[in-house]
Amino acid sequence: MPSFDVVSELDKHELTNAVDNAIKELDRRFDLKGKCSFEAKDKSVTLTAEADFMLEQMLDILRSNLVKRKVDSQCMEIKDAYPSGKVVKQDVNFREGIDKDLAKKIVGLIKERKLKVQAAIQGEQVRVTGKKRDDLQEAIALLRGESLGMPLQFTNFRD
C-alpha cells in the first residue's frame, strides 16, 4: 500500500548559517555595532541588546536571514524579553517534530474530509496510508493548504 510520512524537521546546519549571517550583519550595522549580540546554542538563540527596540531590529535581521537560508520562521518560538543587568535579553527557541496535539489535529483534518486514507501517529511523525497514490496526493494538498502553525515536510513517499 502506498504511504508517506508527515514530519516537521529543522535543518540545523542552515540554522547555524543563518545565525552566523545575522552576526555578520550586526557587525555591518552602524546603529547596532557593539551594542547587540546573538548567542546560538543547539536549537535556541539568545538575543542581547541595550534596549527593547534593538531586540525588534535583531529579530527582523534573524528572520530575514532565516528566509534567505530557506528555514521556515514558523518554527520560531519567541519568548518574552527580560532585563539582565544593563542589557535586555530575549530567547528564541526553534521547534522540531510534531507534538501530540498537532498530530491529533492532522489526523482529525484527514478524517474530517473523509479522504480514502488512514492516518496514524508514530512518535513525532504521522504516517498516512491509502490504496491509491491520488488519494495520498489529495491528502498532501489538504495539509499544505491548512495553516497549522508548524512547517510540514512530506517524506518517505512509497508506492
Curated annotation (Swiss-Prot):
Name a GO molecular-function annotation.
nucleotide binding
Q: What happens when the gene is disrupted?
A: Disruption of the gene leads to reduced adhesion to monolayers of human bronchial epithelial cells compared to the wild-type. Mutant has reduced persistence in C57BL/6 mice compared to the wild-type strain.
Read off the Pfam families from this record: DUF520
Q: Which residues does 3',3'-c-di-GMP 2 bind? A: 131, 133-134, 159
The protein's UniProt keywords, in alphabetical order, are: Nucleotide-binding, Virulence
Q: Which residues bind 3',3'-c-di-GMP 1?
A: 33
Family from the record:
Belongs to the YajQ family.
Q: What function does this protein fulfil?
A: Cyclic di-GMP effector that significantly contributes to virulence. Binds bis-(3',5')-cyclic diguanylate (cyclic di-GMP or c-di-GMP), an important bacterial second messenger that controls a wide range of cellular processes.
User: What name goes with this protein?
Assistant: Cyclic di-GMP-binding protein PA4395
Q: Which organism is it from?
A: Pseudomonas aeruginosa (strain ATCC 15692 / DSM 22644 / CIP 104116 / JCM 14847 / LMG 12228 / 1C / PRS 101 / PAO1)
Give the taxonomic lineage as stored in the record: Bacteria, Pseudomonadati, Pseudomonadota, Gammaproteobacteria, Pseudomonadales
